[in-house]
Design a protein with these regions (language model features):
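Membrane-anchoring hydrophobic helices of lipid-metabolizing enzymes
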Residues: 1-85, 90, 120-121, 129, ...
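Residues that cap or flank secondary-structure elements
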Residues: 6, 62-63, 86, 112-113, ...
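Non-catalytic C-terminal accessory region of glycerolipid acyltransferases
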Residues: 24, 32-35, 72-77, 100, ...
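Catalytic core of membrane glycerolipid acyltransferases/transacylases, capturing the structured
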Residues: 77-136, 161-166, 172, 197
């Protein structure tokens, strides 16, 4: 993936996103991050066949978990929580780390368009030990899980069309408020969860303190905005710490936030594009 990935048209999303995160990086530094991100993605895809080894600490693989002592959901089994993460390292693994705290969780996943491949990945995910619910445009499945007292886990660093513009790396990104709204509705905790690739197939999952609104007297919409803004700040910290472990193959910011300098940098960064040629092609 580190060789072929940067040649794909999708890599221009990587370049634009990294140019926003690291505006002072030159073309070579940006391209190095693109390669690192593709390598991490390739490793994560290969690890589906070995999720059982990772989940159970076999053959040199495993998960080290660091847990905040402030999470009530872990000490009060009847209390659900909303766990949120980003497309970092192997983003399937936080669910297993939560299950290892003797806390059941339902992981929300995006089904693939290929039914056969989707079924294969679904079988591999069984090693995580959690319930699996396909993502939907409706929040009803999430409400059903929380109503039944089950925690949910969501990946929420994507740009969404129906979200709120909240800062991420100094620029507004359309951010979903759904996790915070659900936490407020069910009076449960909103908990950021980070995963890092430490070495090969060894990982560290950090379960942070629950996120609270800045103003407890604000209305619920404003509380949700404040909470998700804090989640975005967590994402900023994680991405700066391990940028090559961030999968950002989709647009994170609106096109209009890319100014002329960004576009100039991106064009210079892509060594697989030549004037007069046919643009990016897979090797």
């Amino acid at each position: 993936c580190g060789l072929v990935g940067p040649r794909l048209p999708k890599s221009n999303h990587f370049r634009r996103n990294f140019a926003v995160v690291f505006p002072d990086h030159g073309p070579e530094q940006i391209e190095n991050l693109v390669r690192e991100s593709w390598r991490n993605f390739g490793a994560s895809m290969a690890e589906y066949a070995h999720l059982d080894d990772i989940a159970h600490g076999k053959r040199g693989a495993g998960i080290e978990t660091v847990v905040s002592e402030k999470i009530r959901a872990f000490s009060e089994p009847e209390r659900p929580a909303v766990f949120v993460g980003a497309h970092m390292a192997n983003w399937e693994l936080p669910a297993r780390a939560i299950v290892d705290q003797n806390h059941p969780v339902t992981a929300i996943f995006t089904p693939l368009q290929n039914p056969g491949l989707d079924a294969l990945l679904h079988r591999c995910r069984r090693a995580l030990g959690c319930r699996l619910v396909p993502a939907s445009e409706s929040v009803r499945p999430l409400i059903a899980e929380l109503s039944a007292g089950r925690s949910i886990g969501l990946i929420v660093d994507q740009k969404v069309e129906t979200g709120e513009p909240l800062p991420l790396f100094g620029r507004d990104k359309m951010t979903t408020l759904v996790p915070a709204r659900l936490a407020l509705r069910f009076d449960c905790e909103l908990v950021p969860v980070q995963v890092q690739r430490i070495d090969g197939s060894r990982f560290r999952v950090t379960i942070f303190d629950p996120v609270e609104p800045d103003d407890p007297h604000a209305n619920n919409t404003e509380k949700a905005r404040q909470m998700m803004a804090k989640v975005n700040r967590h994402f900023e910290s994680w991405i700066r710490e391990n940028p090559g472990q961030w999968y950002c193959g989709n647009r994170r910011w609106p096109k209009r936030v890319s100014n002329a300098e960004d576009i100039k940098s991106i064009g210079a960064t892509n060594p697989h594009t030549r004037s007069g040629g046919s643009g990016n092609r897979a090797a």
